[in-house]
C-alpha cells in the first residue's frame, strides 16, 4: 500500500532533522506528487531546493534553484495565501537574489491583495521603489 501524503511529509521532516536535505527534498517532491494541494510539501520543495542557510543568511542560489523555488512558492501562496513565510521567501528571491525589482513589486502587490492591512508588503514595495529611484511613486502607495 502506498504512503499517504502526510506520512511522506513526515519522512521529509525526519530527513531534514537528521541533516539529509537531499532526502528531505525527495520526500517533499513525493508528497506533492501524491497531493498537489499540500502547501507544506510545496514549501519544503522551495526551501530544500535552495542552498542551506549559514549563519542565519541564505547563500546565493543559482538561477535554476531560484526558478524551481519560485515555482514552488507560487504554488504555496496559491494554495495558502496566508502563508507569510512563502511570501517573504519569494520576495527575498526576486529582489535580493535575482534583482527582479519590478517582479518584486508585483509579488508584494499580490500579498497586499490578500492582506490589505499588513505593513510588510507596503514597506517592501517602498524599498524597491526607492532602489529604482521612483521616490514620488512611494507617496502613492
What is each residue range found by the language model?
Residues 32, 77, 91, 95, ...:
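A conserved position within tetratricopeptide repeats
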Residues 1-8, 60:
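TPR-adjacent "capping" and linker segments in tetratricopeptide-repeat scaffold/adaptor proteins
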Residues 18-27, 53-75, 97-110, 132-141:
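Structural signature of tandem alpha-helical TPR/SEL1-like repeats
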Residues 30-51:
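Short, charge-rich amphipathic alpha-helical segments embedded
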Amino acid at each position: 500500500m502506498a504512503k499517504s501524503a502526510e506520512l511522506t511529509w513526515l519522512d521529509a521532516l525526519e530527513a531534514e532533522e537528521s541533516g539529509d536535505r537531499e532526502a528531505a527534498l525527495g520526500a517533499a517532491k513525493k508528497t506533492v506528487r501524491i497531493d498537489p494541494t499540500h502547501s507544506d510539501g510545496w514549501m519544503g520543495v522551495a526551501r530544500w531546493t535552495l542552498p542551506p542557510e549559514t549563519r542565519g543568511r541564505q547563500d546565493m542560489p543559482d538561477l535554476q534553484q531560484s526558478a524551481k523555488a519560485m515555482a514552488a512558492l507560487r504554488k504555496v501562496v496559491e494554495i495558502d495565501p496566508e502563508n507569510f513565510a512563502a511570501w517573504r521567501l519569494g520576495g527575498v528571491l526576486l529582489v535580493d537574489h535575482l534583482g527582479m525589482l519590478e517582479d518584486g513589486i508585483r509579488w508584494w502587490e499580490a500579498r497586499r491583495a490578500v492582506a490589505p492591512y499588513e505593513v510588510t508588503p507596503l514597506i517592501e514595495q517602498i524599498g524597491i521603489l526607492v532602489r529604482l529611484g521612483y521616490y514620488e511613486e512611494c507617496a502613492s502607495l
